[in-house]
Design a protein with these regions (language model features):
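Charged (often Lys/Glu-rich) extended helix/loop segments that serve as interaction or gating elements
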Residues: 1-131
């Protein structure tokens, strides 16, 4: 059998692993020094079989509610992103070498998603429905 970790993120946020198997280091927040003795596939939330961040990756035991950090996504994470299946892009967090972090891009909102509809009569109705 195989164990899977399903995360809130998906290929919308980081397409490289799904597209061509790019490796990104993954840690479990607060368990950085724990032994990596459990093998998992780390999967995204899209309904596509290639929406995976890692296959057969050894990580510490992961429990419901744990936060996973996918490292070294760089500029390509956002630049290669897309709004497949209506998924909105997540915020981006910069992890500094000293362990501190900061948000460098906010999460998309439904208003962002529909922004290019502003030239159509339905746009005002969409905005009303979002409020």
């Amino acid at each position: 059998h195989k164990e899977y970790i399903g995360v809130d993120s998906c290929a919308v946020n980081l397409m490289r692993p799904a597209m061509y198997g790019a490796y990104h280091h993954i840690t479990v927040l607060g368990k950085e020094d724990a032994p990596c003795d459990h093998k998992y596939d780390v999967t995204g939330s899209l309904c596509e079989n290639n929406d995976k961040f890692a296959i057969d990756r050894y990580l510490p035991k992961v429990d419901m509610g744990d936060l996973l950090v996918i490292h070294d996504t760089g500029a390509h994470g956002f630049a290669m992103g897309y709004n497949y299946n209506g998924k909105l892009k997540s915020s981006e967090i910069l992890l500094h070498e000293d362990g501190s972090f900061e948000m460098i891009r906010r999460a998309e909102t439904p208003k962002d998603y529909f922004a290019t509809f502003d030239c159509f009569p339905i746009y005002e109705k969409l905005l009303e429905d979002m409020e």
